[in-house]
Amino acid sequence: MIPVSLVVVVVGGWTVVYLTDLVLKSSVYFKHSYEDWLESNGLSISPFHIRWQTAVFNRAFYSWGRRKARMLYQWFNFGMVFGVIAMFSSFFLLGKTLMQTLAQMMADSPSSYSSSSSSSSSSSSSSSSSSSSSSSSSLHNEQVLQVVVPGINLPVNQLTYFFAAVLISGVVHEIGHGIAAIREQVRFNGFGIFLFIIYPGAFVDLFTTHLQLISPVQQLRIFCAGIWHNFVLALLGILALVLLPVILLPFYYTGVGVLITEVAEDSPAIGPRGLFVGDLVTHLQDCPVTNVQDWNECLDTIAYEPQIGYCISASTLQQLSFPVRAYKRLDGSTECCNNHSLTDVCFSYRNNFNKRLHTCLPARKAVEATQVCRTNKDCKKSSSSSFCIIPSLETHTRLIKVKHPPQIDMLYVGHPLHLHYTVSITSFIPRFNFLSIDLPVVVETFVKYLISLSGALAIVNAVPCFALDGQWILNSFLDATLTSVIGDNDVKDLIGFFILLGGSVLLAANVTLGLWMVTAR
């Protein structure tokens, strides 16, 4: 949930700004000087909205717009083609996203949920917590577009990345419009930045009369320039992300494991034998981990495959086991240990007569320095008198052996997703002690936000929807293509209106259902 303190600060801050503005504008003594100050600085204030416009950058914009005219002509021609394709493709993309959302809503109905409580401990043998998990159908839902709500599906500690990426994407978008307008001989009045509640953005002020006088194709180059620049920025971000290991090679190396950068206070991985900042994880069970992608894939495999077992000799099994009374849990699994034990785990195995038995064993002694297995046959390769013991845990709970040498292995008992969400990692390991382990994470996270938000700005703005770039792209496109075919402007305008209406309804449906999906959970 959104922290109450954040809401109070935002609402309180805007209240102070608006009331101060109102008092100064109502004051007999300060009214004229205050309004003159606002006008001279290009500032305007309204409820939850502040806007700043300046002509300081006009010289720079004109310099960029008049440099290498032929190259810019080709550049914005590419942008025009991209914009038209993106406008029509956005219908397909929004339609697909809407269908995915509806399918997810059906999958997330009450009948599709299953939950189980899981406990874990990180004292002498494992890490401890309790929680519940839902059906896996919603975990693998990947959508190109998703509604983002700060504090709900956007972590509060990543708001800085989010808003910085939003501002940069907006500035690049408007720079595209500004340069294209100057290239097409449209007067450029100024550039500005605004803040709406907590969302920053940018804008350019163009002379409307000039825009109306130029040809539809010239208008298309201007209107498509913003989303074209956002698309290029996203591509550059992807390139930077791919080349990041090479760029940071003199200072950081990769490919040997993942480095722990943060462990949440409520993480089940916290404990005397848990994970610590600076630990290098090399394996999850028998799954080798060389980078972040391996870590995620290993956790996915562990989560969606049956619990793996461990080979143990008959003599060790006899030595460690003791008489137990097995009973069924509510989810149908079997328990045979004291519920309050932090070191013992219930294991199941088949004896030489293929009869399933259960025994309570000290987890660390039972699984330490043993090979993994699925059946007794996997253990016969090393010793004829060995059994494959499998932890008898609740439905979504797993026992995971986390190798982080030179420390002793961590034994984690719980849902793999809890390990995923409460432990922060990086693939970059510093070559020198004075280097920060957080720097690559900061750079990588910011670039990912920049790619996502710049790409999203390109897609959403291309939608033929009222008040978005897509509206003006569509109008200019219809003027350029249908004027010679349809002589009646009213018919052409009617076609444009229905396309805009369809795009607006489609976008509104995606946003509404997306918000409902995010906030209703």
Curated annotation (Swiss-Prot):
Record's catalysed reaction(s): Cleaves several transcription factors that are type-2 transmembrane proteins within membrane-spanning domains. Known substrates include sterol regulatory element-binding protein (SREBP) -1, SREBP-2 and forms of the transcriptional activator ATF6. SREBP-2 is cleaved at the site 477-DRSRILL-|-CVLTFLCLSFNPLTSLLQWGGA-505. The residues Asn-Pro, 11 residues distal to the site of cleavage in the membrane-spanning domain, are important for cleavage by S2P endopeptidase. Replacement of either of these residues does not prevent cleavage, but there is no cleavage if both of these residues are replaced
Binding-site residues for Zn(2+), renumbered to this chain: H173, H177
Catalytic center residues: E174
Cofactor(s) recorded in Swiss-Prot or TrEMBL: Zn(2+)
Domain of life: Eukaryota
Family annotation (Pfam families): Peptidase_M50
Keyword Protease: yes
A GO CC term assigned to this protein in UniProt: Golgi membrane
Protein name: Membrane-bound transcription factor site-2 protease
Organism name: Pongo abelii (Sumatran orangutan)
The organism's taxonomic lineage, starting at the top: Eukaryota, Metazoa, Chordata, Craniata, Vertebrata
